[in-house]
């Protein structure tokens, strides 16, 4: 009997326009924080912080390099950059007593927001950092598309269900 326990990320790689970004020390995948507004009044016992269907607050990717690199410099250009983040995730199958891995692939269209070149410290990393705005994100887990968010084209899919399809139709976008 299978009893999968997700454990950890084994390692990851970041690719810019299909080419490996060297020197990345850490990456923070964007959070999905929905836009909300309060609903209150007659017939409601209190306040509900109601999400706006398929709409999200700013989604950002944070990358940290050990030092300033040419790839860091390239990412500061004022244009959309295509990034692919790949991670190998470790799982333990307690039923079979074996380890296995699954691939996490996060595809992003990224626009630079902030960049810090870090600190100059003898014998240590600089901690060069960048934050990028993400208007488009697709997450695949173990080869299956799980989430797609396209803010500019009114697409928000979770496990194949497009929660903005009717909104696009209502706006005469289909």
Positions of the model-derived regions?
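Eukaryotic N-proximal low-complexity acidic segments or loops
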Residues: 20-24, 39-46, 86-90, 125, ...
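Oligomerization/assembly interface segments of phage tail-like spikes and tubes
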Residues: 48-69, 124-137
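A generic structural micro-feature
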Residues: 53-55, 77, 98-102, 122-126
